[in-house]
Each structure stands twice: as structure tokens, then as C-alpha cells.
Amino acid sequence: MSRRRLAMIGGVVIVFVVIVALLRLRPGDSSTSLETPWGEPDLQGIWTSDSEVPLQRPAKYANREFFTDQERAELDKQRADAVGREAAADRRDRGSEQDVGGAYNAAVFSTHKRMGRRTSLIVDPPDGRIPPLTPEAQKKRSVMREYYLALIQATDLCKNKLPGCEGGQYGPPSPRRSETPPYYVTVGAAGGGGAGGGAINRADNPEDRGLGERCMQAALPDFGGNAGFYLQIIQSPGRLSIFYDTGQGQGWQRIVPVTNAPHLPSHVRQWWGDSRGRWDGRSLVVDVTNFSPKSYFQGSQENLHLVERWTRLDANTIEYAVTIDDRTTWTRPWTVKQEYTKQSDQENRIYKEPRCHEGNYGMPALLLGAREQERAFAEKRGPDPAMECTAGCGGFAFGFSDTGEDSNPLSR
């Protein structure tokens, strides 16, 4: 065989090998191997939590880490029965406000998930509960709760003593309606006060509404929730990207540099913090700091500090563990563990752009409606807006019941 022909064959072989290598390195491709071509544990793929586990352990299961099979079956049945009652309800008997509140029903919530084995995602403290708030955090929550209750005190919510008005009293419209909120309104500014989701009972501007209504509710850490949760992990040497598809199209993305470089300067604050990753054996450990003061997780904001551990347990399972710390919010750190199950790359798609803002006519319509209410009251054509609930000021604890009855048996 001539040298020329040998050279041609050699060139073809080299090109073929390069193409195969590039295909193997293509980000996001799944592999049967649990290791990347460059020798790191492979976390890539589309993942979800396919069972329902409460964040905190319900009091009646204190000191028990696992449900029995019988308890799991009974809890599944109770949830299914509650959803069935909601589906059978006649919408004609509702007012407009309750009908809007009921829009978040079984079609939105992931009620099809079966109960998991564990009684809580929290594994430390051993009681499975979020540690107590610090005095500083308790005061902040109390101040915001007091303000929230003042703005709903003239509504039927308090008149009828429905869920959401706990701690409040029915009375005339409060002069505090004209006040600036004591703190930035977030997901939990209401201190757990009803379905306002952190919104206050006013619509002077978008900032009066909760982060969810403003398509800004996505937060870290993200344990999923009732409205669905998927994530996609893509790896490359020195970098890992995570695409979250969660809630009502409120997806988001984060990039984790795998580096020894220090965090950003302390004055640089980001909505999902600043991540720095390193490999510890088979686990990717990610340190996250520098959160924005407008972000929110269970009462914590700019002082939130996370240490995450991502571990591939087998071909179909990732364990996600995160230790959560903020000494201005909780009396001690606490740790959550959650398992994600691998999904088909062919049958699922993660949307890289959040869809919540696209076609979101709800916010401008709500603000326009509030202005019309004010005009009608000024012209003596309608009631005082302070006596109305703006987009539901509470009373729909889980999105299923007009009476505020919670269809989640774990919260009873």
C-alpha cells in the first residue's frame, strides 16, 4: 500500500476519533457512564423529585424519620379525596374572588405525586423542624405581620374570621393603607398570612404584590413544590450549569464555577447568590453567599449562606443535601436532603427562558382594576377598596378549598 494511501486512511481515522470525542463532550448529553470524559462524576441529565415529602416533620410524627407503608397509602387517599371534592364543586356557587382563588387547583399542583418514605426533608435538627427564629427575625416578622393585618382588617376575611386573619380583628379601614411597607414585600412578608403569598392588600404599584405575582418567586435553595419541579444539569470542565423549570413558568438558571477562586466582593449581591464549587470525592460541594436583600428564603435574605452537596448515587439517582445558615434568622444551621430521579432526555424539555412574564396580563390588569375601584369609590359608585380583598388577601390555604380548608393532610 502506498504511503499516500496510508496517509489518507490515517487522516480519516484521526478525523473520526476527533468527531467521536467531540460528541462525547457535548454538554447536556446523557451517558450510561457515571463519569465525564474528563474524569469527574457525571451529574448531567434532567432530574425531578418524584415523591411528596414535607419540608418539616408534622408534629404527630415527631421523632419518626419514616412513614409506614399504611400511613403513606392513607395520606395518598386523603389527598386524592380532597382533590375530588374540589373537582365536584359547582363553580356557579362561588363569587368571582373565590373562583379566581380556585384557579390554582389540581391541574396546577402536583397532587399526583405519591408520599415519600421520609417524614421530612429536614434531617438536622433530628426533630425534622426548622430551628427557632432569632429575636431579630421574630421582631421583623411581627412588624410585617402587624402591617399586613392592618390592611385586611376591614375585609370579609377578618369579618368572617377566615384563615389568613389569625391574630387580627375586624374593624374600619386602617390609616396605615397609605404607609410604605416596613420591609420590602417578598414571598413571605405576610408572615405566613394567607394566600396573598407575601402580597399586601393593596395594589398601588407592582411592589405591593408578592414575588410570585411578579414572576420573581424562584429562590435558592429550591426544593420544588406543589406546582412541579424539574432541573437540568450540564457540565463542562471547570463549570456546571443548572437550569430550573419550576412553578408557573418561573424557571431560572445558575452557573457554578468549579474553582478555588474567592467569592465576589461582599458588596456585589445577586438574586441567587454567588456559587463556588469544588469536588470532595464523588460529591460536588457548592458554597453559596452574597444573596440580594430582595431575595427571600424562609425569612432569610442577604445573610443566607448555603453549603450544597450534589452526589450521584447510581445511574438514576442524585442526592442533594444542603446546610442552611443565617445567624440573623435562625438559632442554628439546619440541613435538608432530597433525592432526584433521572428523566428521559427525549421525552422531556427544560425551557431555558422563564415563561411567566410572557403574556402576563395579570399584573397590569390588577393595577388597572385597582384604579377603577378607587374612581368608583370616589364617585360613590362602589365600596371602599380598603374593604375588598385585592387578588385574594388570604383564606385559600392550599388552593383547593373555598373555606380555607387545607387539602394537604400533613398540615392538619
For each feature predicted by the language model, list its residue ranges:
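PEST-like low-complexity, intrinsically disordered acidic/proline/serine-rich tracts
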Residues: 2-412
